[in-house]
Curated annotation (Swiss-Prot):
Residues 241-262, 502-536, 561-603, 630-730, 752-828 are annotated as: Disordered. The modification Phosphoserine is found at S698. PANTHER family: PDZ DOMAIN CONTAINING WHIRLIN AND HARMONIN-RELATED, WHIRLIN. It is found in: Cytoplasm; Cell projection, Stereocilium; Cell projection, Growth cone; Synapse. Residues 242-257, 561-570, 655-674, 756-775, 785-800 have a biased composition (Polar residues). Forms homooligomers. Interacts (via C-terminal PDZ domain) with MYO15A; this interaction is necessary for localization of WHRN to stereocilia tips. Interacts (via C-terminal PDZ domain) with MPP1/p55. Interacts with LRRC4C/NGL1. Interacts with MYO7A. Interacts with RPGR. Interacts with EPS8. Interacts with CASK. Interacts with CIB2. Component of USH2 complex, composed of ADGRV1, PDZD7, USH2A and WHRN. Interacts (via PDZ domains) with PDZD7; the interaction is direct. Interacts (via N-terminal PDZ domain) with USH2A (via cytoplasmic region). Interacts with ADGRV1/MASS1 (via cytoplasmic region). It comes from the Eukaryota. Residues 589-598, 636-651 have a biased composition (Pro residues). GO terms for molecular function: identical protein binding; protein domain specific binding. Involved in hearing and vision as member of the USH2 complex. Necessary for elongation and maintenance of inner and outer hair cell stereocilia in the organ of Corti in the inner ear. Involved in the maintenance of the hair bundle ankle region, which connects stereocilia in cochlear hair cells of the inner ear. In retina photoreceptors, required for the maintenance of periciliary membrane complex that seems to play a role in regulating intracellular protein transport. Transmembrane segments: none annotated. It comes from Rattus norvegicus (Rat). This is Whirlin.
Length: 920
């Protein structure tokens, strides 16, 4: 064996070194030439030499799970089981060289010594012995035969492919047929009558179990069941020049904000000698502080300086972009809320700041749901302790509630929590919802409890409100307060919604089947299929080589770091005896709207009460370039439930925005005579909501060439938010086009489609539980005193700053040129002045799609399109500056619009639009 590894020197390769040899990369059953790095070839050779074919398959499953989730802890924990000898553990340093740099620090920590794992105890199986003489972890057969057609089986299941896990037995009723035949809680059901359950959804598993009188189950004694989801926020980090970088060394674990502040400053090594400094600021009359900050405890971050104005006191005192503010006037900024930090910096003319030169900034955030498991030793406790504290039911490392026995999905018999209280629901809602959303949900529940609305109306309203995977799980707690006579209807409606979302997210082709091995417990099973890899055994080695190469060469979210904003969501737990067929349609009942709660904003220009918010918005990769966000359709989602009014949209004058608000603030105590855009503006990240049961992919991004940028011009004030309150598209394939100044080329960043249903909402209502673009378009990239001081809100008539009304004409297109599906031959010419640094629209569609012509789905606040006031969400764009978009694919149409905005030949763009959709 040593002879086989003579050429496998760990120290001979360096991270990122590229090999010159070409090798075949497996993908969709085909092979193509690709340059593989020396690290990839080295690891692949070692895998062939050290592992058997089944072990390599398990290794492939392990990498699939890591590639889908980017969870280093799960990767290392699985490798501890697979690499069970010192010789096999020689693969670890080779694997380290091909994982993304941002994960290597965590990989080193979890593997103890960095390169080699210490000797570990074997994986502990359940203490009870498996029936029929099978040892723990072995596959056995359980035969169940109903004496009557409608006799119950006596057990409940949870899990499914929509949750990224298999099908597990979560409850076995005492004295039931299942108990007599040896079925146990914690068993994973692999097959039912020769039908594999490896990749089936929860509903499909129920159908398979109820479809026959005689059942022969192949079960695996896993000794654990999925307990729920913990939602982790993943951040990308950049340096002051906008280049992607690794996270700060003080944030490796994602639980820092929950530590005591006194402990953090020592345990996280924030106060090493030379790292921090004291800055004494005394603001005289007419002098501005000139700081732009980002972060806050509500985002799991500290307070970071993202902008320093030229000539300000902050610049004179040596503050710079990339500094973290640790303390101000004796008040710790390590776990302070964003608004409190803004208030404190505004409140004094004499500031003593303690700052640390971190040299990194949080750039963009995405949300990842991680499955938490309940060990066999705690399963019985979780079943019997219905009123117990949920935090006591999870495995090690789980600090938040993770398991409840009455979740949404279907009727549950013995495993339901009939005595769930509203306090438990309120506690979960505090973790998952904003105050506004929580108040709205409680309003609907009060209306239902008072008999004002029916259970159907309540469920439909909650579907509209709980529009993300994490939020949707709250239905498990809502079920506890549903009246007994309404439980069947409630379960039926929720199950129907789940099935609809599953169908909407069906992959285009079959994926690689899962196995019952220990290393694939948490495998989502979608990553290989989503990349089109072959599913045949003969291509296993090519798949493994392709996966390793992909992991090293994919432009990943460099510098990601899991933060503390974790929230836990329960998995559906369904008794196979009580599921009814979802065949009825949802009624169109409109409940009364909730009282409009107050909205407040995160971003303020400190010391300037009448100035609009300065948003730290231009992407970091260039000084001040404009951007347009586009989206292309992937899978159409069903229309939103009828009769449910969307959540009230906060206006620009409100004091607090929704959670999707940018987490930045500009700080200035006095109005400076002039303001210039910084050399490094930071991106404003817009969060997009996703429907239930998401699979979050890491969005690739391209490095943007630096571009010299002139100062941004004045922007027209935005109109009323009611001007663009149209609903956005449901399922989108987001494409970001960064429109640079004419001396640079635009970048195009693509993010994989999230095939979930999404209910209609406006941009200001978007939840932060969705996928975040790695770089996005600026919303308000520049700010000048002339464009912001003493200016009122513009009305829907939309006149420019000189009082001249923008031209708007209507004309009729020829019948021969009418796009297919256009209901009326009426079009409108709208002239959009380039009044802001960004155009600020998102489009979907293009040639060869279900939407032949691009349609506007989002209009960002502060952009030129928003300032114009005439472009609306839903407008179909026929021409841009006289150039037709017929026959142009999505990317080409986006390029045409981007070039039209970028050109200096004219200071406006003429859009020929129609009010009607062009859906075919």
């Amino acid at each position: 064996m040593n002879a086989q590894l003579d050429g496998l020197s760990v120290s001979s390769s360096s991270t990122g070194s590229l090999g010159s040899a070409a090798a075949a990369a497996g993908g969709g059953g085909g092979a193509g030439l690709r340059l593989l790095s020396a690290n990839v070839r080295q690891l692949h050779q070692a895998l062939t030499a050290l592992l058997s074919e089944p072990e390599r398959e398990q290794f492939t499953h392990c990498l699939n799970a890591y590639h889908a989730r980017r969870n280093v802890f799960d990767l290392v924990r699985t490798l501890r089981v697979l690499l069970d000898s010192p010789v096999k553990r020689r693969l670890l340093p080779m694997l380290r060289l091909v994982i993304p740099r941002s994960d290597q620090l965590l990989f080193d920590q979890y593997t103890a010594e960095g390169l080699y794992l210490p000797a570990t105890t074997p994986y502990r199986q359940p203490a009870w012995a498996a029936p029929d003489g099978a040892g723990p972890g072995e596959v056995r057969l359980v035969s169940l035969r109903r004496a009557k057609a409608h006799e119950g089986l006596g057990f409940s299941i949870r899990g499914g492919s929509e949750h990224g896990v298999g099908i597990y037995v979560s409850l076995v009723e005492p004295g039931s047929l299942a108990e007599k035949e040896g079925l146990r809680v914690g068993d994973q059901i692999l097959r039912v009558n020769d039908k594999s359950l490896a990749r089936v959804t929860h509903a499909e598993a129920v159908k398979a179990l109820k479809g026959s009188k005689k059942l022969v189950l192949s079960v695996y004694s896993a000794g654990r069941i999925p307990g729920g989801y913990v939602t982790n926020h993943i951040y990308t980090w950049v340096d002051p020049q906008g280049r992607s970088t690794s996270p700060p060394s003080s944030l490796p674990h994602g639980s820092t904000l929950r530590q005591h502040e006194d402990d953090r400053r020592s345990a996280l090594h924030l106060l090493q000698s030379g790292d921090e400094k004291k800055v004494n600021l005394v603001l005289g009359d007419g002098r501005s502080l000139g700081l732009t900050i980002r972060g806050g405890a509500e985002y799991g971050l500290g307070i970071y300086i993202t902008g320093v104005d030229p000539g300000s006191e902050a610049e004179s005192s040596g503050l710079k972009v990339g500094d973290q503010i640790l303390e101000v006037n004796g008040r710790s900024f390590l776990s302070i809320l964003h608004d409190e930090a803004v208030k404190l910096l505004k409140s004094s003319r004499h500031l003593i700041l303690t700052v640390k030169d971190v040299g990194r900034l949080p750039h963009a955030r995405t949300t990842v749901d991680q499955t938490k498991w309940i060990a066999s030793s705690r399963i019985g406790e979780s079943i019997t302790n219905s009123a117990g504290f949920p935090g006591d039911l999870t495995e090690e490392g789980t600090n938040k509630p993770g398991f409840y026995k009455g979740p949404a999905g279907s009727q549950v018999t013995l495993s339901s929590l009939g005595n769930q209280t509203r306090a438990l629901l309120d506690d979960q809602a505090r973790h998952l919802l904003t105050e506004q959303e929580r108040a709205t949900m409680m309003y609907y529940l009060d209306q239902y409890r008072g008999g004002t609305i029916s259970v159907e109306a309540l469920v439909m309203a909650l579907f509209e409100l709980l529009n993300t995977h994490a939020k949707f799980s709250l239905l498990s707690e809502v079920r506890g307060i549903i009246s007994p006579q309404d439980l069947d209807r409630f379960d039926h409606l929720v199950l129907r919604r789940e099935i609809e979302s599953m169908k909407a997210r069906q992959p285009p082709g079959p994926g690689v089947g899962d196995t019952y091995s220990m290393v694939s417990y948490s495998d989502t099973g979608s990553s290989t299929g989503s990349h089109g890899t072959s599913t045949t055994v003969s291509s296993a080695r090519e798949r493994l080589l392709w996966l390793i190469d992909l992991m090293e060469n994919t432009l990943d979210l460099e510098g990601t770091c899991e933060t503390t904003q974790g929230s836990t969501n329960a998995l559906p737990d369904v008794s196979v005896d009580d599921v009814r067929s979802p065949s009825e349609d949802l009624p169109g009942i409109k409940p009364p709207p909730p009282p409009p709660p107050l909205a407040q904003g995160h971003d303020r220009l400190l010391g300037q009460t009448r100035k609009p918010v300065r948003e730290d918005s231009a992407p970091l990769s260039s000084a001040a370039h404009s951007g347009i966000v586009f989206s292309a359709p992937r899978n159409r989602s069903p229309p939103p439930p009828p009769g449910i009014a969307p959540t009230p949209t906060p206006g620009p004058s409100s004091a607090r925005d929704s959670p999707s608000s940018p987490i930045y603030a500009s700080i200035s105590h006095a109005n400076p005579s002039s303001r210039k855009p910084l050399d490094t503006h930071l991106a404003l990240v817009n969060q997009h909501p996703i429907g239930p049961f998401p699979r979050v992919q890491s969005p690739p991004h391209l490095k943007s060439p630096p571009a010299e940028a002139p100062g941004a011009g004045a922007c027209l004030p935005p109109p009323s938010p009611s001007e663009h309150a149209d609903a956005m598209g449901a399922n989108q394939h987001f494409v970001l086009v960064e429109v640079h100044r004419p001396d640079s080329e635009p970048d195009v960043n693509e993010v994989r489609a999230l095939p979930q249903t999404r209910t209609a909402s406006t941009l200001s209502q978007l939840s932060d539980s969705g996928q975040t673009l790695s770089e996005d378009s600026g919303v308000d990239a520049g700010e000048t005193e002339a464009s912001t001081s003493g200016r009122g809100r513009q009305t829907a008539n939309t006149k420019n700053k000189n009082g001249k009304e923008l031209p708007q004409t209507e004309r009729t297109t020829e019948g021969a040129n009418k796009p297919p599906g256009l209901l009326e031959p009426t079009s409108t010419l709208i002239r959009v002045r380039k009044s802001a640094a960004t155009l600020g629209i998102a489009i979907e569609g293009g040639a060869n799609t279900r939407q032949p012509l691009p349609r506007i789905v989002t209009i960002q606040r502060g952009g030129s399109a928003h300032n114009c006031g005439q472009l609306k969400v839903g407008h179909v764009i026929l021409e841009v500056n006289g150039q037709t978009l017929r026959g142009k694919e999505h990317r080409e149409a986006a390029r045409v619009i981007a070039e039209a905005f970028k050109t200096k030949e004219r200071d406006y763009i003429d859009f020929l639009v129609t009010e009607f959709n062009v859906m075919l």
